[in-house]
């Protein structure tokens, strides 16, 4: 059987900076059955080739709903679609016999765009979360469960491990999984970040002492740990944990928090919400800067409705590219001064954006 797999993000060039794990598992599953599998691009797929059955079967996966694809490719009888870009709530996951097959890391051979495609083993040790964040793909989950042992997706020829777990710090077997990862001798990283609110000092020390990925340098000082600060209601908890973290940290490293903005949990998106949203966003960023932590601003698609659209874009540009501040380039002094120049920039820019715009009821940005 001839199998064509389509990675919508990868071949569209929009967001395809990471291999599609589900497609790699599907590929290996079929190869084990003796089938021929190839990565297919949109330019090779058209209504004629699709309906003339150039391939016996197509698997199409899309991670992001915003990724545009030709409408006709979903209409073939031999077409199977999946991924969070099509089904946001995991309604159509892989069968167990495919889910627990080792990924086919050769699927993207010759098409690699970065080190994720050829240097990392990729997989989940746990799945799920109990936070029920309304913007999250796991909003209908109520627990964190063990998914697979590390050896299930480990390619011993690859130097690093990338974990896609949703909330590893919320799993009861947290320490056992870190021991399992450390035992491989390979540096590893949790791409989705970790839940900072759940970090006890014991868990912090387990993370610090682990064989965590540090990029091109082998120094612990080159490590970057990712967390999230999405809700202003977590302010006191994050502040308390940051104080514990920086009071006990054994070596210097980078701490980055994803900061969500522009999302209304009540789904009303009124002027009052956007006023509060920008203030809450600034307050969260200021707290992180005060400790020397990094803020990485994540803008929900509805931020475009905000009267403070321009400030949110400014904040994103400043925080996510820290050497670029208000159109001027700065050197390492920004990082060495623990982001205080960025803190001052926000302080000086806040008043000019936070004037109530009484005549603005809604804003549409093209």
Q: Each predicted region: which residue ranges?
A:
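Canonical Radical SAM [4Fe-4S] cluster-binding loop centered on the CxxxCxxC motif
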Residues: 16-22, 116-157
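Ser/Thr/Gly-rich flexible loops in soluble cytosolic domains mediating phosphotransfer, phosphorylation
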Residues: 79-110
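Conserved, mostly hydrophobic/aromatic
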Residues: 30, 129, 133, 163, ...
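A structural motif corresponding to the C-terminal lobe/cap of the Radical SAM core domain
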Residues: 214-224, 233-366
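Core AdoMet radical
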Residues: 5-8, 57-63, 137-242, 252-261, ...
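A general structural detector for well-ordered alpha-helical segments in enzyme core domains, enriched
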Residues: 26, 68-75, 177, 203-207, ...
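A short, structured N-terminal alpha-helical element that caps or precedes a catalytic domain
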Residues: 1-81, 85-89
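Anion (oxyanion) recognition and catalysis
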Residues: 31, 182, 286-290
């Amino acid at each position: 059987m001839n199998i064509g797999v389509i990675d919508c993000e990868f071949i569209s060039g929009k967001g395809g900076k990471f291999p599609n794990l589900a497609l790699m598992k599907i590929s290996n599953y079929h190869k084990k059955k003796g089938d021929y599998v190839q990565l297919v691009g949109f330019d090779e797929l058209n209504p004629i080739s699709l309906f003339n059955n150039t391939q016996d079967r197509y698997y199409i996966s899309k991670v992001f709903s915003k990724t545009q694809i030709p409408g006709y490719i979903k209409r073939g009888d031999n077409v199977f679609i999946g991924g969070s870009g099509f089904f946001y709530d995991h309604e159509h996951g892989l069968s167990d016999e495919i889910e627990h097959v080792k990924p086919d890391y050769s699927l993207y051979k010759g098409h690699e765009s970065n080190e994720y495609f050829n240097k990392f083993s990729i997989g989940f040790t746990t799945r799920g979360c109990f936070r029920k964040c309304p913007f999250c793909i796991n909003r209908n989950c109520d627990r964190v469960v063990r998914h697979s042992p590390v050896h299930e997706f480990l390619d011993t020829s690859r130097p690093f491990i990338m974990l896609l777990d949703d909330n590893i710090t919320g799993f009861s077997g947290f320490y056992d999984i870190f021991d399992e990862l450390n035992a491989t001798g390979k540096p590893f990283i949790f791409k989705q970040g970790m839940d900072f609110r759940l970090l006890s000092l014991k868990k912090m020390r387990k993370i610090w002492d682990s064989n965590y990925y540090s990029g091109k340098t082998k120094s612990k000082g080159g490590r970057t740990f990712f967390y999230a600060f999405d809700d202003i209601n977590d302010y006191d908890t994050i502040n308390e944990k940051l104080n514990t973290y920086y009071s006990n940290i054994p070596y210097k490293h980078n701490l980055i928090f994803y900061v969500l903005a522009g999302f209304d949990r009540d789904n009303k998106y009124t002027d009052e919400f956007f006023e509060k949203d920008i203030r809450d966003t600034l307050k969260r960023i200021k707290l992180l800067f005060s400790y020397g932590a990094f803020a990485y601003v994540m803008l929900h698609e509805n931020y475009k409705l905000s009267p403070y659209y321009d400030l949110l874009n400014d904040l994103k540009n400043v925080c996510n590219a820290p050497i670029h501040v208000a159109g001027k380039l700065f050197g390492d002094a920004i990082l060495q001064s623990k982001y205080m120049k960025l803190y001052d920039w926000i302080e000086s820019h806040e008043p000019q954006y936070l004037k109530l715009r009484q005549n603005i009821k809604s804003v549409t940005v093209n």
